[in-house]
C-alpha cells in the first residue's frame, strides 16, 4: 500500500554499505520505521533527504513490518541544526528523548507538536541545550517518573528563596533548613530550581521569549540528565558526543 505522510526524521541508522533505516515521527504522532534503500549513494538523491531533522512529505510502501521509502518531498531541511556540532548534538538529544519515550504502536500527537516547536525555536536562535531541557521536562512522565522543584521534599516548605538543591535521598528539592539531612544533595542555584518548575508547568504555546543565562542552562541540563539516569536508568547516545565536546572545550 502506498502511503503519504508528513513527518520529521528522529532517527537514522546506517544499514549495510548503501542503505539506511530511518524513523519518522509522523503528523499523527506515531513512529514509522522505513528502509531507505541506497540512501547513502549520492546518485539516488536520498542522501540529504534522509538526514536527522528533515521535515517533509514521506512517500513509502507499507505492507507488513517495516515500510520501504520511495521518495521525500522536503519541506524543511533544518540546515541550521547541522551547521554547529553543539547545536546538532543537543537537537539530537531532544529527538532521541522523544523517540525513546515511545513504544512501538504508541500514538502521541503532543510529541509531534513538541518536536516541531523545539526545532523551530532552535532554528530561530534559541539555545538548543535549553530546548533539550524543555523536551526532557515534558517527557518525564513517559519514562515513568516526575520531579518536584518548587517545595522542599522534607518539610514541604514552598518558599522558593529557601530552596538550595535537589535531594535524590528525598526525591525532590531541598531547603537550606533541611540541607543537613542530605549531605549528598546536588546544590543548585535558586533560579535554576525556579526555572525548572516554570518550564515544567508552562505549556509550549506560552513559551515565547526564552532568554536564560548560560550558567543556569548548564545547571538545568546537568540535573535533568542526572534525574533520567537515576530514575529511569537512561543514558542517551547523544550525550556521549556532548560529553566529548565539553572535554574539548576545557
Swiss-Prot record:
Identify the GO cellular component terms for this protein. bacterial nucleoid
> Which Gene3D superfamilies does the UniProt record give?
Nucleic acid-binding proteins, Recombination protein O, C-terminal domain
Judging by the UniProt lineage, the source's domain of life is Bacteria
User: Which GO biological process annotations does it have?
Assistant: DNA recombination; double-strand break repair
| Disulfide-bond pairs as recorded | none
Name the keywords, alphabetized. Answer: DNA damage, DNA recombination, DNA repair
Stored InterPro entries: ARFGAP/RecO (IPR037278), DNA_rep/recomb_RecO_N (IPR022572), NA-bd_OB-fold (IPR012340), RecO (IPR003717), RecO_C (IPR042242)
Family from the record: Belongs to the RecO family.
Q: What does this protein do?
A: Involved in DNA repair and RecF pathway recombination.
Q: Which HAMAP family match?
A: RecO (MF_00201)
Q: What is this protein called?
A: DNA repair protein RecO
The record lists the organism as: Staphylococcus aureus (strain MSSA476)
Amino acid at each position: 500500500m502506498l502511503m503519504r505522510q508528513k513527518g520529521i526524521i528522529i532517527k537514522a541508522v546506517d544499514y549495510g554499505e548503501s542503505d539506511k533505516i530511518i524513523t519518522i515521527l509522523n503528523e499523527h504522532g506515531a513512529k514509522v520505521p522505513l528502509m531507505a534503500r541506497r540512501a547513502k549513494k549520492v546518485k539516488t538523491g536520498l542522501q540529504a533527504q534522509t538526514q536527522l531533522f528533515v521535515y517533509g512529505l514521506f512517500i513509502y510502501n507499507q505492507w507488513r513490518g517495516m515500510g520501504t521509502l520511495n521518495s521525500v518531498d522536503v519541506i524543511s531541511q533544518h540546515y541550521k541544526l547541522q551547521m554547529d556540532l553543539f547545536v546538532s548534538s543537543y537537537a539530537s538529544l531532544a529527538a532521541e528523548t522523544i523517540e525513546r519515550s515511545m513504544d512501538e504502536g504508541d500514538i502521541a500527537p503532543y510529541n509531534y507538536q513538541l518536536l516541531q516547536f523545539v526545532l523551530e525555536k532552535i532554528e530561530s536562535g534559541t539555545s538548543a541545550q535549553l530546548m533539550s531541557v524543555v523536551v526532557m521536562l515534558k517527557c518525564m512522565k513517559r519514562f515513568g517518573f516526575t520531579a518536584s522543584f518548587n517545595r522542599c521534599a522534607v518539610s514541604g516548605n514552598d518558599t522558593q528563596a529557601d530552596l538550595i538543591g535537589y535531594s535524590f535521598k528525598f526525591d525532590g528539592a531541598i531547603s537550606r533548613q533541611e540541607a543537613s539531612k542530605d549531605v549528598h544533595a546536588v546544590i543548585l542555584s535558586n533560579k535554576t530550581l525556579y526555572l525548572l518548575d516554570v518550564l515544567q508547568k508552562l505549556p509550549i504555546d506560552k513559551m515565547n521569549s526564552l532568554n536564560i543565562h548560560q550558567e543556569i542552562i548548564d545547571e538545568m541540563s546537568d540535573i535533568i540528565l542526572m534525574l533520567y539516569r537515576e530514575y529511569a536508568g537512561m543514558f542517551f547516545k547523544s550525550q556521549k558526543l556532548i560529553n566529548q565536546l565539553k572535554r574539548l572545550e576545557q
